[in-house]
């Protein structure tokens, strides 16, 4: 699962197709939900900083998570390109 940890406003300006948005400051209150998904999580954000924090936070509670870094650099299709 691709987890975009930018703000809702940033996410709404464009995001990786199929990604889920939970802003970094809301990760803590969503840990149980994310752990129950039982899937590996790739975090992303605008620069890679917030996604790194989120990946460490998820990993600390036993969730398989890696920092995918800046979603801009992945060059995957975004919702803006698919419309």
Language-model segments: residues:
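Rhodanese-like catalytic fold shared by cysteine-dependent sulfurtransferases
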Residues: 8-40, 49-83
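Short, surface-exposed ligand- or partner-binding patches at beta-edge/loop junctions that are enriched
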Residues: 44
